[in-house]
Amino acid sequence: MTMLTAVAAARAEVCRLHAALVTAGLVAWTSGNVSARVKGDGDGDPDLMVIKPSGISYDDLTPESMVVCDLDGNRVDGEYQPSSDTASHAYVYRHMPQVGGVVHTHSTYATAWAARGEAIPCVITAMADEFGGEIPVGPFALIGGDEIGRGVVATLTGHRSPAVLMRSHGVFTIGGTANDAVKAAVMCEDAARTVHLARAYGNPPPLPPDQVDALHHRYTTEYGQR
């Protein structure tokens, strides 16, 4: 696949995944974003990223409107300015080479946990499966530069969770692909809602670490079609 073909495919995929955020109820108005890494072709072309344009309605997004940037956050191709979170996405890609996709949302329940500055405890098996433990809280950081990206990397490095609650802001998720990162965002909101409701009726106990390990191992090595 040529770099040109790979970029076109990434634009189509990133556009489709933004629609998935809307379908899942994770975003409102123009907030939130998905990006995908485009691997260099091995002939000297560096990795690129494709990301949502800033301030454009989800109804108006097309593959052609997705913005191509280098991993310093500079626009390489596209009619529009990229998302205000571009520098942070780029920082994640530079410092976490295993990451192929990044997602940011202000989904309601997960952002409520972020506003409290509280990690979501691992009290249900679905969390052990997907996150391998609690969903951690990252530091407060201002929007616009790469400070959020720095917080994401610092929090998730060495952590099994693909999701982080950035304090008083919202959710960032990572994945081997952009689709994986969107899945993590969907599952993060589902876990945040479930644990919030459980807390309304009492104080659910965390799962024992050995059970979390066993559940996460089974999910990541045996679940699904392989």
Residue ranges and their predicted role:
Residues 1-226:
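Glycine-rich flexible loops
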